[in-house]
Amino acid sequence: MKKAVILVSGGADSATVLAIMREQGYEIHAISFNYGQRNNAELRKVTELVKEYNVKQHKIVNIDLRAFGGSALTDDDIKVPHYHDTKELPEDVPVTYVPARNTIFLSYALGFAEIIGAKDIFIGVHTSDSANYPDCRPEYIKSFEAMANLATNIGGVTIHTPLINMTKDQIIKTGLRLGVDYKNTISCYDPSEDDLSCGTCLACTIRLDAFKKNNVQDPINYILF
């Protein structure tokens, strides 16, 4: 069985990629990050999520990105914006962007992959992300892959982005087809202390809209509903 590494949070995108990897027959090795994020409820969800997909091993890496701040997810002085409708969502880079986060995460994943002899790395970036986050764009992924093959001894590394051309509603549709239980995920940037999603941050707004477009009720609990 071919080994592969996945960058996994406790979100809907990660769950969908896990299901795709399982369908494709990979031996899955997962890596997650406790980087001081405001939404660390995802770490509690991801522990349960990886059990569903018979992940061979799951590493949680501690990194203190709060030392730099610069994002609403890593700096308590920057508030998470809330919205009433998808029409209100920002068109430029939002304050929830964590500078260089995917570069940091992919670098760790690359090291992990080389150590276990895996040449395939999966990440759940997609169309809805690439419009706002510079490190989710196809050209970024292509450039990182080129760097990875220059920087490692193993060579032949492929960065897989199975969701890259999908909108959020297409991702949910794919996951539902593959039997993903989205009840065990959380996407919220600003969850309550008891891990309820706010329902109005950028991530919640996009997620709720995606389920609505699929005529399916989002199975998780929200503060407002």
Curated annotation (Swiss-Prot):
It holds the Pfam family QueC. GO terms for molecular function: ATP binding; ligase activity, forming carbon-nitrogen bonds; zinc ion binding. Pathway: Purine metabolism; 7-cyano-7-deazaguanine biosynthesis. Keywords: ATP-binding, Ligase, Metal-binding, Nucleotide-binding, Queuosine biosynthesis, Zinc. Gene3D superfamilies: HUPs. ATP binds at residues 8-18. GO terms for biological process: queuosine biosynthetic process. Its EC number is 6.3.4.20. It comes from the Bacteria. InterPro entries: QueC, Rossmann-like_a/b/a_fold. Its cofactor is Zn(2+). It catalyses: 7-carboxy-7-deazaguanine + NH4(+) + ATP = 7-cyano-7-deazaguanine + ADP + phosphate + H2O + H(+). Zn(2+) binds at residues 188, 198, 201, 204. Belongs to the QueC family. Catalyzes the ATP-dependent conversion of 7-carboxy-7-deazaguanine (CDG) to 7-cyano-7-deazaguanine (preQ(0)). This is 7-cyano-7-deazaguanine synthase.
